[in-house]
Amino acid sequence: KRRGIRIVFDTNYRARNWPDPSIARTAYGGLAGVIDVMLAGEEDIALLFGRSDTDVALREWLDFERCEVVLKCGSGDSRIWAEGREWRASAEHVDKVVDTTAAGDSFAAAFLAARLSGAAPDEAARAGHRLAAEVIRHPGAIIPITAMPNLALVTESTSAIVP
């Protein structure tokens, strides 16, 4: 961090890798003061806390002033706590889902690329949703280069700042 490097952590929680969810919560929570961005899947947080109100669980668990938090919610709106406020971005509707492999990683890649390019949190999340939507239209984790969306064109806002 002293050299200007941003540190990102994706929870990618797998219960079988931890003896108890409380140990994972403590380990992950301890990273909040070290990392710049935490990416968490809604399912991961629900499993970690044993509850469905994931945004409340995150608020109780993390100090949002210390790191940017991105809650990925599958086909639902993503929620981002950054720059002192909460942001939301709508997921793109996909008529025919072929394979969800790499959807979360695709969201993360586009989100981070957009943020590093100076995009606001909501614009970055929209870029993440756009790439994830394209990826799930294809089998497997690697899509044809011709199917890659131009994420620079993701400019029209469909998200909202939550007061």
Predicted regions and their residues:
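Conserved beta-alpha-beta core of the PfkB/ribokinase-like small-molecule kinase fold
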Residues: K1-R59, S75-S78
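Conserved phosphate-binding/catalytic region of the ribokinase-like
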Residues: G50-P163
